[in-house]
């Protein structure tokens, strides 16, 4: 299938926060409760529709273990978007966000779009990080923020789509050099897409997602 652009994503965060599950839910629409630890990187891809254009998302799921951080760093280069994930039931994964963010910004393009994700929102009774804390961290560091559940699929689609919308907005503003693939964007074989039907229904804009739009 032809596409207007290809956007490269990287998923980062501590081990066990649900990075692989978020990828699987988005690409295959299924949840795998028992998942082997990612060794190095895993890969997934899916087409989405942004403003009537077909966009191919190429997603790299990275290992969270410290021993693989050097491998992970090499994938920051050439990524247009990053999903920075923590587990709302494990405070330490939230505390480590600053380290992950420093790594991402040191080794990536300054225009890379970063979506902060508080995953496992289905485990509300075990919550250890308040939603307001995630929102505050995102505001402080200029990130987009959502809480998701890879198990129920709540907000998973929106997280990927809204990241792509922000990347596309930056392209429209001329902030990304789309002719330089080091920025994580590749012009597709057919940039004019005549089909108006995509695999995803229209999603809310980031600005439309208020503090009350949590998972059901």
UniProtKB/Swiss-Prot annotation:
The keyword Membrane applies. Its main location: membrane. SUPFAM superfamilies: P-loop containing nucleoside triphosphate hydrolases. Mg(2+) binds at residues 20, 38, 61. Its cofactor is Mg(2+). GO terms for cellular component: acrosomal vesicle; autophagosome membrane; endoplasmic reticulum membrane; Golgi apparatus; Golgi membrane; plasma membrane. It catalyses: GTP + H2O = GDP + phosphate + H(+). One of its GO terms (molecular function) is GTPase activity. Keywords: Cell membrane, Cytoplasmic vesicle, Endoplasmic reticulum, ER-Golgi transport, Golgi apparatus, GTP-binding, Hydrolase, Lipoprotein, Magnesium, Membrane, Metal-binding, Nucleotide-binding, Prenylation, Protein transport, Transport. Pfam families: Ras. Residues 189-207 have a biased composition (Polar residues). It is found in: Cell membrane; Endoplasmic reticulum membrane; Golgi apparatus membrane; Cytoplasmic vesicle, Secretory vesicle, Acrosome. A lipid is attached at residues 215-216 (S-geranylgeranyl cysteine). Interacts (in GTP-bound form) with GARIN4 (via N-terminus). Interacts (in GTP-bound form) with GARIN5A. Interacts (in GTP-bound form) with GARIN1B. Interacts with VPS39 and VPS41. The small GTPases Rab are key regulators of intracellular membrane trafficking, from the formation of transport vesicles to their fusion with membranes. Rabs cycle between active GTP-bound and inactive GDP-bound states. In their active state, drive transport of vesicular carriers from donor organelles to acceptor organelles to regulate the membrane traffic that maintains organelle identity and morphology. Regulates the compacted morphology of the Golgi. Promotes cytosolic DNA-induced innate immune responses. Belongs to the small GTPase superfamily. Rab family. This is Ras-related protein Rab-2B. The lineage of its organism: Eukaryota, Metazoa, Chordata, Craniata, Vertebrata. The gene is Rab2b.
């Amino acid at each position: 299938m032809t596409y207007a652009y290809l956007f490269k994503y990287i998923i980062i965060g501590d081990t066990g926060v649900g990075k692989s599950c978020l990828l699987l839910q988005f690409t295959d629409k299924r949840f795998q409760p028992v998942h082997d630890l990612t060794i190095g990187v895993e890969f997934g891809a899916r087409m989405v529709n942004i403003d009537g254009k077909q966009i191919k998302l190429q997603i790299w799921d990275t290992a969270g273990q410290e021993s693989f951080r050097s491998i992970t760093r090499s994938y920051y280069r050439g990524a247009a978007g990053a999903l920075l994930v923590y587990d709302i039931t494990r405070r330490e994964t939230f505390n480590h966000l600053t380290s992950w963010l420093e790594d991402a910004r040191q080794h990536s393009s300054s225009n890379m779009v970063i979506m902060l994700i508080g995953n496992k929102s289905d485990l509300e009774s075990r919550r250890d990080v308040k939603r307001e804390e995630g929102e505050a961290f995102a505001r402080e560091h200029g990130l987009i923020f959502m809480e998701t559940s890879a198990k129920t699929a709540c907000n998973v689609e929106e997280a990927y789509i809204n990241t792509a919308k922000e990347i596309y907005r930056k392209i429209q503003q001329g902030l990304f050099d789309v002719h330089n693939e080091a920025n994580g964007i590749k012009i597709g074989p057919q940039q004019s897409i005549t089909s108006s039907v995509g695999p995803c229904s229209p999603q809310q804009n980031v600005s439309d997602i208020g503090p009350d739009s949590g998972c059901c």
